[in-house]
Amino acid sequence: MKRDKHCFDVTEEGLEMDGAFVAPFYPVLREKRLIHTQSPQKVRKEYHIYVKLADGSELGTHTFTSINNIRYSEYWDECCDAELTSTARKGLQIFLQHIVMQQEYVVCYEVERLGLCMVEPVIFIYGYRKAIVPDGINILFSSQVPIVSDEGKQGNIQELLYYAKRLITLRPGITDILFYVRILGVLRPLLEETGCPADFFVGLFGASGTQKSTYAKLFFAEDSAQFLSFSSYNGKQILKRVEQYSGHIVVVDDYHPLAKKYDREKQQSALDAIARNADSGQGALVVITGEFMEGCFSLQDRMIQISVPKSTTDGYVLSKELQQLQCQKDMLGSLVYEFAQKVYGNFDKMKEQTQKLFLQQENNIYTFRIERNIKFLVVAIRLFEICFPEISAWGIEKQLETSLKSVLENQKKHMDIVRRLEYDKDWTREVFLMLSSPGFKRKYEFSKTASDMNEIIVEGDRIYITEMVLEREMGRFLECRVKSSDISEHLSKTQVLEEDQSLARTKKKNGIRYYVISRSRLKLYYLSTVSRDK
């Protein structure tokens, strides 16, 4: 081997240069890499080198970012280059440079997270063993990439689609929407590149026992690291997980601010962080669960709110079906990966198709963001139909249309209430509407037992209601969290609340403290607001 004036040879004793002995070992280049990093976008070089001894035995491979002045004894104990002369060390350096020049670089792309890591070339990472990359592209995983359960259940596409149909038709109005929220999670990186970022998050709300967490685990939490809770994680920890799981969904379970000030503020702060981060349209799509919707108008407007009422069907049958679907949920992961392959394997075509679908939507001026956000679910449905035209035979178009309309109308109604409460705060009017609503339960006499504190009692012109019941019933009526202190303050200002000389807002009767509301004054106040609005 010749390069310039040097000639190298490997003998039984080791490496020779120009006929002179250099060392009883010599380096061998296994591979040299040119690595494109994702963040920051830079290029670095790596050299994978091992050592051969004179007897032909090989020592382990080590990675170097530079081949200059390698101290072999630091990496391979069998090498004694410290005892070599400067001429011999120089000979090893020249030999290494020579063999490096003889080999071509292997171009690699290093990824640091899941989701769409690079657009040119298109690299979409679903999990460690499931990556969508063009042929001939080499990828490396950095230590930052989270490990996800991406084995999935291998089966033909018809089996996977049948499982999806079972999910969608399980509980129309809930499970069909949740399925397409999962699809939307995969599409989020594409939407960002399309210029239509999905800048919102999803809220799953319902009373205790409505199986919100069960639905969330079934549809969204492919890996345990994707299922967080408001009580155990703060906003910073949640956002870090959101950044890691791009192209997936992160669930934050059980929004339920506790009585303790610290817990309450921690959960509220985490919810606020999720809402602010949603504006970027980057990272994982966040799904939260909770018993009620809370927060200012701006925060709630950034949500797609899905209500989960108690099932009218046999609870045992529904739970059994959910359990069966949960045991097979790896089929959903496999189907979603098949969908991701079709989308990110034909990136330019799907990007163009997505833009067309958004242009086909009506661009009306909207009052609430849900009127715009619901269009993202429509696009998700259409793209899924394009990728899997077989589902047109299911005959669920009307069901999906009804479900989307229900989500839209329910949230518009709720947001109208939130806006009215935030900006008008006419609690006295709301109390009248609550007490006058159809089916509202009340008693017309005291039982003089402890059960009275859980009831609304009407006695003549007076309405007796405890602080706890006022908060509970108004919260149910408005479908949001309220404070009795805000309501009682407004009732006092409008002179609807009966007060004595002590100015205490509650009065004791039969050992229980009640707010005492005058029915006649309450009705007069409401009628005055109606005439004022006209």
Residue ranges and their predicted role:
Residues 118-158, 163-167, 350-534:
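DNA transaction DNA-binding modules
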Residues 283-291, 304-307:
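Structural recognition of the conserved hydrophobic beta-strand(s) that form the central parallel beta-sheet
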Residues 297-391, 397:
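Phosphate-sensing "switch" segment of ASCE/P-loop ATPases
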Residues 136-225:
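P-loop NTPase catalytic core of nucleic-acid-dependent motor ATPases
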Residues 246-249, 281-286:
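Loop/turn-to-beta-strand initiation segments
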Residues 267-280:
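Conserved catalytic/switch belt of AAA+ P-loop NTPases
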Residues 203-205, 214-264:
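AAA+/P-loop NTPase substrate/partner-engagement loops
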Residues 1-173, 240-248, 264, 299-301, ...:
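Conserved glycine-centered beta->alpha loop in an early N-terminal alpha/beta scaffold
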